[in-house]
């Protein structure tokens, strides 16, 4: 039924709409004793929040999160953690003209056909506004993974429209620079090209897609539950649940179709793997190498160029989208994708620990 939850041991359930009173999350399965404050969650929320850059939507939300349960005297209690973010900058009047029409490329038509009714204000539940709660919940997972396991999750944008970043080797990425520019890009030259492209998109009344990579380093060997809950399957599921994502690749992804077995099989030596074409996952189980995930996001359909559609009477119309929108939704997607990867990894770690905590590995890990 309703798909508002993710995870089996570490679970996240969210609710809330773009123009509702606020957003809520229940985060369950967090081990007790983790030092946690609202400031810990706010770091990633500030990276995602709208209105912080001229290259994203101009809707301004503080996205200040409140922890309403599950934390006492600065530590998690082991009970469910309740999170709340209040909406403060809705402009629902921007959407009054479209309540009887379907915006092309949006979920308006499918939500209406599925439920027989929809919240037309900013897309309601289908809006990317709901991802704020994913980021808040994911920040909890990221903190646990880093502090207890040494797992670090970081992302960077590799493409916006027809412009590409030339810095793709994770060992050479300056992560401080990535987090200091509005595009989460590792290539200083590409940042200026991205700026020029976004400015031109605004003038032309259109938008573009994007591609980004998320890397998890320090992941222990053994995470993943074959066969239906393979780690890469659950990662792909989590990434595809993000608004506008139309493609997910693990490791070399689609490029493996043009490779040969003798060069793509990630050979092993006592000193470690010789390559990482598989993206840190073999047989659906983490190998201990970096987990590399790439996602592609489509151009936002909310643009100021008129397009064909229909209204609720089934009549042909031409409509122009109004409101405040991102010319490229990929600009703010990096912390969202990081959060989703963290949620999946913590869930799988806790599942693995529950079943295999006393397993003695037959050989020493080579990573």
From Swiss-Prot:
Q: Which residues bind NADP(+)?
A: 48
Query: Which EC main class describes this enzyme?
Result: lyase
One GO CC annotation? cytosol
**Catalyses which reaction?**
5-O-(1-carboxyvinyl)-3-phosphoshikimate = chorismate + phosphate
Instruction: Supply the EC number(s).
Output: 4.2.3.5
Cofactor(s) required, per the database record: FMNH2
**What does this protein's record comment on cofactor binding?**
Reduced FMN (FMNH(2)).
Q: Which keywords fit this entry according to its UniProt record?
A: Amino-acid biosynthesis, Aromatic amino acid biosynthesis, FAD, Flavoprotein, FMN, Lyase, NADP
Protein's pathway: Metabolic intermediate biosynthesis; chorismate biosynthesis; chorismate from D-erythrose 4-phosphate and phosphoenolpyruvate: step 7/7
A biological process term (GO) from this entry: amino acid biosynthetic process
Pfam annotation, one family: Chorismate_synt
What GO molecular function annotations does the UniProt record carry, in alphabetical order? Answer: chorismate synthase activity; FMN binding
Q: Where are the transmembrane segments?
A: none
Coiled-coil blocks: none
| Function of the molecule | This reaction introduces a second double bond into the aromatic ring system.
This protein's assembly is summarised as: Homotetramer.
Its family? Answer: Belongs to the chorismate synthase family.
Protein name listed in UniProt: Chorismate synthase
Q: Which organism is it from?
A: Psychrobacter cryohalolentis (strain ATCC BAA-1226 / DSM 17306 / VKM B-2378 / K5)
């Amino acid at each position: 039924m309703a798909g508002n939850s993710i995870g089996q041991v570490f679970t996240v359930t969210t609710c809330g709409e773009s123009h509702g009173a606020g957003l809520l999350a229940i985060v369950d399965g967090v081990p007790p004793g983790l030092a946690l404050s609202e400031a810990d969650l706010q770091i990633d929320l500030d990276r995602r929040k709208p209105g912080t850059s001229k290259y994203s939507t101009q809707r301004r939300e503080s996205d200040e999160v409140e922890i309403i349960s599950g934390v006492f005297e600065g530590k998690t209690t082991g009970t469910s953690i309740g999170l709340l973010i209040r909406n403060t900058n809705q402009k629902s009047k921007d959407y009054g003209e479209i309540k009887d029409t379907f915006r092309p490329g949006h979920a308006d038509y499918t939500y209406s056909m599925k439920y027989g009714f929809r919240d037309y204000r900013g897309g309601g539940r289908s809006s990317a506004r709901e991802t704020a709660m994913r980021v808040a919940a994911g920040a909890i997972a990221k903190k646990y993974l880093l502090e207890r396991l040494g797992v670090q999750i970081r992302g960077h944008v590799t493409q916006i429209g027809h412009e590409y970043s030339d810095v793709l080797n994770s060992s050479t990425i300056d992560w401080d620079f990535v987090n200091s520019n509005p595009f989460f890009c590792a290539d200083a030259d590409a940042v200026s090209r991205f700026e020029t492209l976004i400015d031109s998109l605004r003038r032309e009344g259109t938008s573009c897609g994007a591609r980004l990579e998320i890397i998890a380093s320090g992941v222990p060997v053994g995470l993943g539950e074959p066969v239906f809950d393979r780690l890469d399957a659950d990662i792909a599921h989590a990434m595809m649940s993000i608004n506008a994502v139309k493609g997910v690749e693990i490791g070399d992804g689609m490029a493996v179709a043009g490779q040969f077995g003798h060069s793509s099989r990630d050979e092993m030596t006592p000193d470690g793997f010789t390559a990482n074409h598989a993206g840190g996952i073999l047989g659906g189980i983490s190998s201990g190498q970096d987990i590399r995930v790439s996602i592609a996001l489509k151009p936002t359909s909310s643009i100021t160029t008129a397009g064909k559609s229909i209204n609720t009477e089934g009549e042909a119309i031409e409509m122009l989208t109004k409101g405040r929108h991102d010319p490229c939704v990929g600009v703010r997607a990096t912390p969202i994708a990081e959060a989703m990867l963290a949620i999946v990894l913590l869930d799988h770690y806790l599942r693995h620990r529950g079943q295999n905590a006393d397993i003695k590995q037959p050989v020493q890990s080579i990573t």
